[in-house]
Structures are given as structure tokens and as C-alpha cells.
Amino acid sequence: YSQVARPRF
């Protein structure tokens, strides 16, 4: 995917 927001753990 392009420009994907990574979930904060």
C-alpha cells in the first residue's frame, strides 16, 4: 500500500 498509516502499539 502507498502512504499507509502505521498503527501505534
Swiss-Prot record:
Highest taxon in the source lineage? Eukaryota
Q: Does the keyword Secreted apply?
A: yes
A Gene Ontology annotation in the biological process aspect, one of them, is:
neuropeptide signaling pathway
| Main location group | secreted
Gene Ontology cellular-component terms for this entry are: extracellular region
* Cysteines joined through disulfide linkages: none
Where can this protein be found?
Secreted
* PTM sites of type Phenylalanine amide: 9
> Where, by tissue, is this protein expressed?
Widely expressed in the nervous system. Expressed in corpora cardiaca, hypocerebral ganglion, frontal ganglion, protocerebrum, antennal lobe, tritocerebrum, thoracic ganglia, esophageal nerves, recurrent nerve and frontal connectives. Not detected in corpora allata, circumesophageal connectives, subesophageal ganglion, abdominal ganglion and abdominal perisympathetic organs.
Q: Which UniProt keywords apply?
A: Amidation, Neuropeptide, Secreted
Describe the task this protein carries out: Accelerates ovarian maturation in females.
Question: In which family does this protein belong, per the annotation?
Answer: Belongs to the NPY family.
* Identification of the protein by name: Neuropeptide F
Source organism per entry reads Schistocerca gregaria (Desert locust)
